[in-house]
């Protein structure tokens, strides 16, 4: 049962404010996407993702893969509300040697499942994790292994060929444990997506 909507909105607003504050203090970063994704990250971690904050490396946990690494402020802020990062950690966003770099780096103890790379790579890593889960489930049984893999990708990532290949593989293998959230707003870094690519993304993934 979902938490009270007022509580959920308040939590998401806190993530938004923290994300914007991190970028403002660092005088560097991308606030827009992180603020826009705050509701998603809050709902995912509070209502759907199965994990144990006391045992971040628990084998049976669900996994979340963030593809657009520049949206890291929303992830750090969301994880901070769950005890994985301190407010001091958030203040050190994008600073040399900090645990909150501009683009996330693998740190399972802090809830970071993947190092970000070129757009689309996180999508591929998520599909690989979904394949691994199916492999283990077939051998150990669904009682022990039945976790889900969540991925967050953006318009820019969908334009990359690596994502197209991942979509074909996921469909061919029937990876029903892979749940991809597509942040579709028809915008990329400097233009609308249609300026460089005109495609029916929904139909492409259905195919």
Report the location of each language-model feature:
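Short internal beta-strands
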Residues: 65-67, 177-184
């Amino acid at each position: 049962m979902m938490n009270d909507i007022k509580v959920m909105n308040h939590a998401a607003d806190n993530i938004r404010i923290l994300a914007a504050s991190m970028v403002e203090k660092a005088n560097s970063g991308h606030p827009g996407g992180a603020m826009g994704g705050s509701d998603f990250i809050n709902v995912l971690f509070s209502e759907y993702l199965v994990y144990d904050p006391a045992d971040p490396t628990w084998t049976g946990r669900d996994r979340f893969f963030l593809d657009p690494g520049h949206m890291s402020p929303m992830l750090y802020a969301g994880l901070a509300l769950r005890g994985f990062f301190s407010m001091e950690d958030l203040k050190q966003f994008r600073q040399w040697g900090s645990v909150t770099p501009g683009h996330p780096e693998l740190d399972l103890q802090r809830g970071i499942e993947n190092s970000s790379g070129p757009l689309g790579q996180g999508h591929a890593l998520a599909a690989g994790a979904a394949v691994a889960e199916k492999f283990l489930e077939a051998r150990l049984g669904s009682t022990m292994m039945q976790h889900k893999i969540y991925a967050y990708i953006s318009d820019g990532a969908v334009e990359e060929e690596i994502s197209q290949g991942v979509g074909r593989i996921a469909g061919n293998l029937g990876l029903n444990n892979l749940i991809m959230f597509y942040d579709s707003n028809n915008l990329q870094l400097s233009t609308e997506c249609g300026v460089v690519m005109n495609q029916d993304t929904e139909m492409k993934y259905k195919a």
